[in-house]
Amino acid sequence: PARVYRIKTEQTEHGGAIKSGDKVVETTRSGYKVNEYVTKERIDFNPNQLDRSVVSPDQIRKNMESFRDSIYTDMFPERKALWEYIPKTLIFAKDDHHASEIVNIVKAVFAEKFEDGKIPEKFVQKITYSAGDTNTLIREFRTEKEFRIAVTVTLVATGTDVKPLEVVMFMRDVNSDVLYTQMKGRGCRTINDDKLKEVTPNATTKDCFYIVDCVGVTEHDK
C-alpha cells in the first residue's frame, strides 16, 4: 500500500515573487538557454506556475531538505540512518531542464550528510532522453546499491519495474488519472526481503511505499 508524505512550502501554497535585481534565465522545455537578464521590477507568480513556467531553485532546495530530514525520522524511523543507502527514490520532474536542476540540488543537499561533503558518484542521476543509454541507467537503478535517486520526466513512468523502489516523489503535477496511476504504480511492486537487502542493506522488508507529494498531486481529481 501507498502512504502519502506531503511537503508544503510558502511558495507551493501561496506563490512567490522574482524580486527586482534578481537574475532570470529563460530556457526552452529541453533546457536550452535562450535569454538571461536582470529584472528591473518585481514579478509575482502563483502556485500553479511554480515548476511549470517558473522553476525556483530555492523552492527545490526546500523540498529536498524537507525530504532528506524526514527519511529516517518520519518515513523509515526503524532503519539505521545510512545516507549511502537511503530508500530507492524516483523523482518526477516537469521537463529535462527541471530534472537537471533537481539533480544538482539533490547533490548539494545530501552532500551535507556525508563526512567529506561529497555524495557517491552514482548516488543521484537523471534518466531522461538526453541522459544517454536509458536502458542501462534503468537497469543500474534497479540493481546497483550506489544509485539511490533517479530523476525522470515520463521515461520511467510506465512499463518499468524497479522492485526495490520505496519512494515516488512528485515535483510536477499530473492531470491525467491514467498517467498518475502509472507513475505512482512504479512504487507498488513487491520484492522479497533478501533481494531488497541486496540493494538496500539497511532495509528489513518492503511493506509499503511512500508518495512524497510536493505539488498537491494527491489532493485533486484528475
Regions picked out by a protein language model, each given a short descriptive name:
Residues P1-I86:
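Interdomain helical connector at the RecA1-RecA2 junction of SF1/SF2 helicase-like NTPases
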Residues A2, T12-A17, S100-E101, L179, ...:
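Short helix/loop capping segments that flank catalytic or ligand/cofactor-binding pockets
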Residues N63-T73, S100-A111, K184-D194:
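Short, well-ordered amphipathic alpha-helices
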Residues F67-E78, F110, F141-T154:
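Structural motif corresponding to the C-terminal cap of alpha-helices
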Residues S70-P87, E115-I119, K195-N202:
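Short helix/loop segment immediately N-terminal to the Walker
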Residues T73, A93-K126:
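Conserved helicase motor "Helicase C" RecA-like lobe of SF1/SF2 P-loop NTPases
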Residues Y85-D95:
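Conserved RecA-like ASCE P-loop NTPase motor core of nucleic-acid helicases/translocases
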Residues F123-D221:
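Conserved RecA-like P-loop NTPase helicase motor core
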